[in-house]
Amino acid sequence: VYGLDASEYLLFAASTDNACPPQASINSQGLWDELSEADLAQSRVAYSLALASNVLSRADELHAAWAVDEGNFVADFANAGLGNSVYSTSQEALNDLSDALFYVEKVVKDYKLARPIGILGCSQITCPENVESRFSRMSKEAIIANLQAAHHIFTGAQGEETSLGLEDYLVSVEGGEALALPMVESLTQTVAALEGMDSTIYDAVAEEG
């Protein structure tokens, strides 16, 4: 298992049990029981280092793909429909940009929120075990980061700066302003509401259940 979710478990989960079935050799042969707390801690450290190295490598690859002096995908996007861009038309680039925003609906709304609060894929009142980052209790911060990224994509701006983004394109299209401005306002208000929460999402969901 690779990724930040595995790293989270290694760093924050307190259990010293394993989830392997009884017939697995590590359990059936008593290998797990032979491990001391120090052995388990050392194994967690070693695995965490391997995971961190993998995440760093993937992050470097992503950065290189966009970097002007390397993959320069930013030029492909900016010059969509021109020259050697991977996009044959500017509309294709805009479609990719708008598709990326559906992460908020499909993942943030339906997966990160609807599942734990009992709306989707949950047979109980709430399912706190479905909360993202439940071991570190960092789900709220992760969702805030997702929404801030969506705001950045939509407006082209980060923080207090001003820039051109998908919002400006929609405003320039007849009837588009009625969609663009409420989206910006909704993203801003949702981030503010999350930042104003006193508890973690896990604790809030568990309390409701």
Q: In which residue ranges do the predicted regions lie?
A:
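Mature extracytoplasmic or organellar-lumen-exposed domains after removal of signal/transit peptides
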Residues: 1-209
